[in-house]
Each structure stands twice: as C-alpha cells, then as structure tokens.
Amino acid sequence: MTVIGTPFTDNATRVMLLGSGELGREVALELIRYGCEVIAVDRYAHAPAMQVAQHSHVINMLDGTALRAVVEQVKPALIVPEIEAIATDELVKLEAEGYTVVPTARAAQLTMNREGIRCLAAEELSLPTSPYRFADSLAGYQQAVREIGFPCVVKPVMSSSGKGQSTLKNEADILPAWEYAQSGGRAGKGRVIVEGFVDFDYEITLLTVRHKAGSEIKTSYCAPIGHRQENGDYQESWQPQPMSAAALQASREVALAITDALGGLGIFGVELFIKGDQVYFSEVSPRPHDTGLVTLISQTLSEFALHARAILGLPIPTIEQRGASASSVLLIQGQSEAMRYHGLNTALANADTEVRLFGKPDINGSRRLGVALAKADTIDAARDKANTAIAAFKVDL
C-alpha cells in the first residue's frame, strides 16, 4: 500500500523531476495534489515545473557527476525523467544502488536515442516498422539514403520535438538534411537514422499506462489521439481519433508489447502509423507525451494524473474519455526574455475552451509557449475552437 509522508519533514515523499518543461509542470502539480514534495531539475532556471515545485536545481543533466550529486543530496523516493537528454548511464548506476527510476533506468536509456528503441521494437520484438538504416558519417549516411530510397526521413538518433528532422525527396536534399541533423541533436553532432517513408492514412499516440491493480501490474489504454505535425513538431492533437476496431486492437497489441518490454510503472506515449488496419510502430516515450496535452480537457484523469497515480502505486479503476476534444499549440518565433501575452479574454470567450500558458522564461528561435484546449460535439468543431483560441493571441517580444 502507498504511504505518503509530509512535505518539508524527514518522512516527505520526495519526487525528483529530471526535466521541468510544460509536461513536467503538470506532473508536478498532480504529485503535489497527492502530498508529494517535488524537486524540479533542469538545465535552465525558472523552467515551468520549477515555478510550481517546492524545490529546484539547475544542472547539466548530461553530466553524470552533476546528476549524481543532486540525487545524493535530495535522496528522492522516485526519480522521474521528463526529457531524453539525461546521463542515462548514471541513472542505471543509481538504480542499481537502490534508487527508483521511473519507469526504469533501462527504459530511459533505450528511449534516449532512436537506435536503442528501434532495435528493440524491430529486431527483438519483431514489431512492424518502416525500413531503416543508421549512419555516423557522411559517407555512411549517403549509402543509407541510397539503400532506403526516396522519399525518406532523416533524424538525429538523439533529439526530440522534430529538432534536426528532414524529409528527403531527391538528391538535392541529401547534404542539407545531413547538416541540419548534425546541428539538431540534443547531445550534439552524431549518429542519424534514415527511415523509409510510410504511406500512412494517419498517425496516433496511444497513451498506455502500466499501473498497480492489487498485487498485479495492469496495462490500460487511453482513447487514441490523432495529431498533426509540422517538421516533426506537434501543432494540433485531438481525441478520440476515429479508427477501425481492427486497427485499434492491433495498436493496443503493439503498445502492450513495447511497454511490457520496457517495464516499470507509468504512462507511455506510443506513436504509431496507421494504414487501413495495418499498424506500424514509430516511437515510444516512457513519460507523458506532448500530444497528450489534449487530455487536460478530454479525460477526467489527464495523462499527467494517470502518470502520477501509476508511479505512486495508486489504483486507476477507469479512464473516462469526455468526448470530442482538441488541442492547438501557441508556437512563437523570435527572441525575448520578457514576453507579454495579449488575447486571453478573446481566447476564453467560447464555452468549453481552456488555455495553458507555460510561463517559459525566454524565447530564442521557435518555442512552444502555450496550448489551447477545446471540447465540442465533433472533432472538427473542437479543432476549430482550439485553433480559433490560439489565433486570438498576440505575443509581444
């Protein structure tokens, strides 16, 4: 049975978030609701989760020595990675010493780069995927493109949110895509994956939760989430995504296989391509997923609430979906350390519409600063409402 201590005492249930962005902030809020003492860690100060957590630390999370130092200082009951760019080798050592890493240190290590998780999915579990090759040199990359053929997609093996990702349509795209991939990786220059283009009808995120049910571990699923990407970065998501019963069942089978292989407790964002009733595995995140922000309005328990319950060993008797819902992101380009947001009154004028501003401390380039959430009678109507809310915003930089 789960026992929660009292914050700011010796018996506090301390949970350390490694990564303190907008997803981490929602997780922190849910954990605090259950009485946890949250420690938010990131590479920069005043990150969104730091603004709500009881404590915060700024470190280079790719530095194993710095990571170990803050863990040994805090001695958390749970270490919860919220991003990929972490010294996962150190997490493996810490777990072996008795610390609990969510869902497991191995899951964090495998999903930190696309090579580990793709090899697990395609080669160990025999899940259907797009054809792929890995390369760590320009010559090897050019050979990989020749073998895969056009069109294809190139991504750094270590990146997220579409950074460094390109679609290649012909020979002229080869060199620019390589250079962009080398600049877009989270851990600097390095290895890339070249993937054959899947001719899919749509793509989904299937949020999959491994949680306690008595003495057993049970797997539960949220309704499928459809989403629209631009340059690998999510722009809109909606739930539920209409799909055939056969495709939904196949999606759940793929999600079950990959999450069982990763193990542990918590929510997983399983990304899948759907073509008719055929399902192709794309990626998995062992944590809440950005497209799952829609669940803040579409479910009685959001993906963040589900994650908090699961990692604390609490029951999840049911996952209730509340009907057609959508999210639309506030993506801004520019430079500023003091943004001002106009249009909130207009954005919230429609019924069943909500907004989350993430409170990010600065912008240098393109950055997601907020999200609009909407419910309606149909998916199209919900998307229109969410997009209308975002269109109301003007951000002064």
Swiss-Prot record:
UniProt keyword annotations, A-Z: ATP-binding, Ligase, Magnesium, Metal-binding, Nucleotide-binding, Purine biosynthesis
What's its top-level EC category?
ligase
Record InterPro entries:
ATP-grasp, ATP-grasp_carboxylate-amine, ATP_grasp_subdomain_1, PreATP-grasp_dom_sf, PurT, PurT/PurK_preATP-grasp, PurT_C, Rudment_hybrid_motif
The GO molecular function terms of this record are: ATP binding; magnesium ion binding; phosphoribosylglycinamide formyltransferase 2 activity; phosphoribosylglycinamide formyltransferase activity
UniProt key word Chaperone: no
Listed PROSITE patterns: ATP_GRASP
Protein's name in the database: Formate-dependent phosphoribosylglycinamide formyltransferase
Organism source for this protein?
Answer: Alcanivorax borkumensis (strain ATCC 700651 / DSM 11573 / NCIMB 13689 / SK2)
